[in-house]
Amino acid sequence: MSNLEKSLRHEVILDIIESKCICKQEELIIELKECGINVTQATLSRDLHEMNIIRKSFENHEHRYIVTKEDKFIKKFKNIFKSSVRSISMQEYFISVNTLDGMASLIGEFIDRLGDGRIAGTVAKKNHILVLCRSVNATQQIFKELDSLRV
């Protein structure tokens, strides 16, 4: 597959998502096929991830795919987090993040700038960050989110 084919496929996917209510990947595969593009579910899933297209739940319990606008700050945070974090653990209201030497302050600042209301604050040293969460449930959710950035 050439980059041109991939770019064309991405363009068609974007047009379909923006013009139609697509609730399932199977529906999108059918729409692509009608446009002359054959794609496997695995390839489509990768494309959706690369294009920041997510399946969102709405108040009426409807799910559909939408394009998210992930800004440069978030991308930069994810890259730095992934390359700098050695380990992460949690206990009740706290998440402990162990980083490469000198990276804790930067990552702590990134976490603070996310503006997540579930986080009360961070304390950073040379290679360690303590994330203080507002509830045990928030700790578990944030831990999963931060831990998934390491993959």
Curated annotation (Swiss-Prot):
Where does the protein end up?
Cytoplasm
Task: List, alphabetically, the InterPro entries matched.
Answer: Arg_repress, Arg_repress_C, Arg_repress_C_sf, Arg_repress_DNA-bd, WH-like_DNA-bd_sf, WH_DNA-bd_sf
GO CC, one annotated term: cytoplasm
Which biological process annotations from GO are given for this protein? Answer: arginine catabolic process to ornithine; protein complex oligomerization; regulation of arginine biosynthetic process
Q: Does the keyword Transcription apply?
A: yes
Q: Which GO terms describe its molecular function?
A: arginine binding; DNA binding; DNA-binding transcription factor activity
Q: In which pathway does it act?
A: Amino-acid degradation; L-arginine degradation via ADI pathway
- The entry's keywords: Arginine metabolism, Cytoplasm, DNA-binding, Transcription, Transcription regulation
* Superkingdom assignment: Bacteria
Q: Which family, according to UniProt? A: Belongs to the ArgR family.
Describe the task this protein carries out: Regulates the transcription of the arc operon, involved in arginine catabolism.
In Swiss-Prot or TrEMBL terms, this protein is called Arginine regulator
Native source species: Clostridium perfringens (strain 13 / Type A)
